[in-house]
Amino acid sequence: MAAPYVSDDSGKYIASTQRPDGSWRKQRKVKEGYVPQEEVPVYENKYVKFFKSKPSLPPGLCEADGTTGQAQPSKPDADASLSKTAKRNLKRKEKRKQEKGEREQVEETRQDLERVNISDTPVQKNVTSAHKNGSASSDNSAAEKAKKIKNLRKKLRQVEELQQKIDCGEIIQPSKEQLEKLARRKALEDEIEDLELDL
């Protein structure tokens, strides 16, 4: 809030004002050319000034036409201003959404098929429930196998790193455990291969 100025024959003054608590401020003399802090313009660099002076509408479009143009979706303009990477990322997102939608449709169809009963015989119901239990256990075993494969690959990677260190001369005399690790390489490879075939 700007303070009210009072001009007198002796100069310019900021009039006395009342504080919120009821007490009064003294009037203050103002030197010639003084600009109060609230009235000092905020510094703006040349780029800010340029963008503020830039019209919001494109050349040739007046205010009356501008309101109808804003109602239209600006999707094509947004694509034109994006970089190659941003466009690629948008395409990936759209592709993921489509794949997710397809997966959801497949999942819904699968669930619908599970709900449908062709015949209401008790034997058929027992078979389907046994099949569901078997598929759940097979899912668990598949997950366990995948986990085991991951662990075996990690061990194999460690063996390969150890072999490289020995070959390049970092390790001159490998310890007994290191030699045992190297000897297990073939067994690890065979076990990984067997587990991958089971999956």
Swiss-Prot record:
Domain of life according to the entry: Eukaryota
Pfam family, one: Mago-bind
Compositional bias segments (type: Basic residues): 85-95
Signal peptide stretch: none
GO BP: exon-exon junction complex disassembly; nuclear-transcribed mRNA catabolic process, nonsense-mediated decay; positive regulation of translation
Keyword Coiled coil among record annotations: yes
Disulfide bonds: none
Biased composition (Polar residues): 118-141
Keywords: Coiled coil, Cytoplasm, Nonsense-mediated mRNA decay, Nucleus, Translation regulation
Region named Disordered: 1-30, 54-147
Main location: cytoplasm
Protein's cellular compartments: Cytoplasm; Nucleus, Nucleolus; Nucleus, Nucleoplasm
Coiled coil feature spans: 83-199
Biased composition (Basic and acidic residues): 96-117
Complex formation: Interacts (via N-terminus) with magoh and rbm8a; the interaction is direct. Associates (eIF2A-like region) with the 40S ribosomal subunit and the 48S preinitiation complex.
Protein family: Belongs to the pym family.
Functional description taken from the UniProt entry: Key regulator of the exon junction complex (EJC), a multiprotein complex that associates immediately upstream of the exon-exon junction on mRNAs and serves as a positional landmark for the intron exon structure of genes and directs post-transcriptional processes in the cytoplasm such as mRNA export, nonsense-mediated mRNA decay (NMD) or translation. Acts as an EJC disassembly factor, allowing translation-dependent EJC removal and recycling by disrupting mature EJC from spliced mRNAs.
Protein name: Partner of Y14 and mago
Taxonomic lineage: Eukaryota, Metazoa, Chordata, Craniata, Vertebrata
Gene name for this UniProt entry: pym1
